[in-house]
Every structure is written in C-alpha cells, then in structure tokens.
Regions:
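Short, glycine-/polar-rich solvent-exposed loops and beta-turns at beta-strand/coil boundaries
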Residues: 10-14, 78, 159-162, 246-247
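Proteins synthesized as precursors that undergo proteolytic processing into mature forms
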Residues: 34, 39, 68, 75, ...
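Mid-domain, small-residue-enriched loop/turn segments at the edges of structured enzyme/sensor domains
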Residues: 92-94, 98, 102-107, 140-180
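Structural recognition of the beta-strand scaffold that forms the well-ordered cores
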Residues: 17-20, 29-31, 76-79, 122, ...
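Conserved catalytic neighborhood of penicillin-recognizing serine enzymes
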Residues: 24, 72-144, 191, 202-233
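Glycine- and acidic
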Residues: 13, 42-50, 129-131, 158-166, ...
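A penicillin-recognizing enzyme superfamily signal
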Residues: 1-10, 18-22, 31, 38-48, ...
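Active-site SXXK
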Residues: 26, 48-81, 86, 123, ...
Length: 277
C-alpha cells in the first residue's frame, strides 16, 4: 500500500492491483484487487485484477513468441521507420482519393523517434511499436491470436475486431489472465491454469475437490526461453530505459515487460522468475 500511495504522489496513480502466481503449479499466491478495499474515492471494493483493461505493450511477447515459432530469430532485422499499413492510404498516412482517412493506420513509437534497422531482440527489449506491428502482420493475426488464447488470454473473442492495434494493447484483458499467461514463459512453455483453491471439504471432512497438477505444453521450450532471455536482457533495453532503470533487480535474473495505455491511463509491469510470476 505504501508503494501505491507513493505512486499517487509521483505519477498520479490513484489505484493499484497485483497478482502473483506460481508458474510451476498455477496456484495463486497473492491477489490484491485495489489499494484499499474501504476507500470509496477509488472504488476500493472493485477487484481490478479481474477487470477488463487495455494491456498496452505488455501484449507484445505473445506476438514475438508466435514469430519465433515460425522461424524468426532474435537477430532478425525489421526497420523502425514511418510505415502506413493500409493500402488505401499513401506512404505519408493520407487516404487515397475515394477512401476514408479513418482507415489509415500509421503507428507511432511512444517517444516519436525512429531508429532504423533493429533486431527483434532490441525491438522487444525496448518496446518499440512499429517493428512490433510489422512482426504482427508477418506472423499472422490469426496465429498470434491463437498463441495468446492458448497461453490463457480468455477475453479476446474476435481478432478482426482489433486488427493490427492488438499488438500494442488494443484489446481488453485481465491482470489475472496476463499473469497466468506470462507463467508459460516462466515455466519453459508449460501452462498450468491458475487456481485459488487447493482443497474443498464438507463438514464431515470428506474431500469434495482437491488440487492436482494439470500441465499442458503450449510453447516449444526454446521459444519460451528466448522470450525470457530478451525480457531479462538489460543491455538490449538500455538505449531506451537506461542502464539502471527500475526494471533491473540487482542480484536476480528477472524477466520484465511493461505496458502503458493511451494517455498513461494504466501502467503495467509484469515480471517473472522460474518460481513466481
């Protein structure tokens, strides 16, 4: 709570939520739905962990995982340059005669800069938007959507509704689903669906329900390890985040991805080790 209150002072973050899951079992270790359950000013009795929110760039690893499954590598190069993705618009993002300007799509990077050729490692580590949208297009919207769904994202029902904006957080997901899905990366490609119940007994002590491990391989181990390696690569993210950012946790090998929604309304940080997400 102290950290959340400090965030309100420094970043105008009026509320906060956190989920922690053991990726080896899927067991929920912590679920805090708001900063203060009794604070009516922030609707404290509302569980933000199960609310639909846009994930921003924290959705990108699902698209990169799909690409790595298809033969792309961390050393594959894409160009971070102004790019119009709609064929009915010109290279400068203006609609061609007879077509609507609203259909044009020329994504921007968060800082407005363009870095030219970038490896996929650099692009993901620094969370650069334009290469991510290009990779989403090249990997296939449908296949990328299936990857996120198989990893535990349950709220995106129609990829055509979002189009290319999905890679930079255009859909709505829950923190609980996102934490669980990142657990697949943490657990070397193996998914354990989240659970908050270990055992249910009746008044006579008879066990009605009991937790049992139910593992399912979702990603090739090498794909999961590659994503984890990039998200823990401080050198690759340094040009954007700096060498000593808050993403660097001294003494621990932690993979971290951030996400920020439009107008900084929501800020996500999802981090994991092999034992906690």
């Amino acid at each position: 709570k102290e950290g959340a209150l400090e965030n309100e002072k420094t970043m105008n973050g009026k509320n906060a939520a956190v989920v922690a899951i053991n990726p080896k079992t899927g067991q929920i270790l912590t679920m805090i739905g708001s900063r203060d359950y009794f604070d009516k000013e922030i609707d404290g009795n509302y569980n933000v962990t199960t609310a639909l929110r846009q994930p921003g760039s924290s959705f990108k690893p699902f698209i990169y995982a799909t690409a790595f499954n298809k033969g792309f590598t961390p050393d594959t190069v894409l160009f971070d340059l102004p790019t119009e993705f709609q064929m009915t618009c010109n290279a400068y993002g203006k609609a061609l005669p007879g077509y609507s300007q609203s259909n044009c799509y020329m994504p921007q990077n968060y800082d407005g800069k363009h870095r030219g050729p970038m490896t996929l490692r650099e692009a993901l580590a620094q969370s650069i938007n334009i290469p991510a949208v290009k990779l989403f297009y090249l990997s296939g919207l449908s296949d990328s959507f299936k990857t996120s769904e198989s990893m535990g994202i349950s709220t995106l029902t129609n990829v055509s509704r979002y189009g290319l904006t999905l890679v930079i957080g255009g859909g709505e997901v829950t923190l609980l689903d996102m934490t669980s899905a990142y657990g697949v990366f943490a657990n070397n490609g193996i998914r354990n669906k989240y659970t908050g119940i270990l055992k249910v007994e009746n008044s006579e002590g008879k066990i009605l329900e009991e937790f049992s491990l139910n593992e399912k391989e979702i990603l090739p181990k090498n794909t999961a390890l590659t994503i984890s390696d990039i998200l823990s690569d401080n050198k690759s993210r340094t040009p954007t985040f700096g060498a000593n950012s808050q993403l660097l946790i001294s003494g621990y090998d932690v993979a971290v991805k951030t996400g920020t929604t439009n107008n900084n309304k929501d800020a996500w940080t999802i981090g994991y080790t092999s034992s906690i997400t």
